């Protein structure tokens, strides 16, 4: 796409130059550059947004309750996305948090939580703690949210390790941490 844009730009410039239209050349160059910038930006951020399942949506009142209780009421959509990723809202541990430190009622083995509401409470408490450790300032603080989400997945130790060693989340340092 970029090669075709460059070629078209060269052709337009030569046509405009032959007619002596300096202003026309500038206008054409600006238009082409704007178009090219939009195309390149859309290629880099081409992510499909999928809605959450009906199972996740059914938990929304419970999610709102515990999000408020744990001090993150503005993060309901993020919590729903975590649940969607972890379980699609299905099963007895929809937040997949049986192994986290906030689980005090069930064994710390995968799938041991048998109460969905308890899973949501524990998962939101864990996510709130991860967001706090990652120094997340708002639901728009994507760098801190990425760090917090990786900490939710790997354990909170990842967050402090990544912050101390690299100052941020990267895919490469997440892989490095997982190999330790």
Predicted regions and their residues:
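Residue-level detector of well-ordered alpha-helical segments, enriched
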Residues: 74-79, 93-96, 144, 148
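Short, surface-exposed glycine/acidic/tryptophan-bearing loops
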Residues: 90-110, 116, 168-175
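Residue-level preference for non-acidic, small/hydrophobic
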Residues: 29-33, 82, 152
């Amino acid at each position: 796409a970029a090669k075709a844009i460059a070629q078209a730009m060269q052709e337009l410039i030569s046509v405009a130059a032959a007619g002596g239209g300096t202003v026309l050349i500038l206008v054409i160059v600006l238009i082409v550059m704007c178009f090219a910038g939009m195309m390149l930006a859309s290629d880099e951020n081409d992510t499909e947004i999928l809605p959450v399942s009906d199972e996740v949506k059914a938990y929304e009142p419970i999610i709102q309750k515990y999000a408020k209780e744990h001090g993150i009421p503005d993060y309901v959509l993020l919590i729903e996305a975590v649940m969607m990723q972890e379980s699609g809202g299905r099963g007895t541990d929809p937040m997949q948090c049986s192994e986290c430190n906030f689980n005090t009622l069930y064994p710390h083995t995968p799938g041991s939580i048998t109460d969905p509401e308890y899973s949501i409470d524990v998962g939101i408490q864990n996510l709130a703690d991860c967001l706090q450790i990652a120094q997340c300032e708002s639901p728009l603080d994507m760098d801190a949210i990425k760090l917090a989400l990786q900490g939710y997945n790997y354990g909170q130790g990842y967050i402090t390790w990544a912050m101390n060693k690299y100052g941020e989340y990267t895919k490469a340092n997440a892989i490095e941490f997982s190999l330790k």
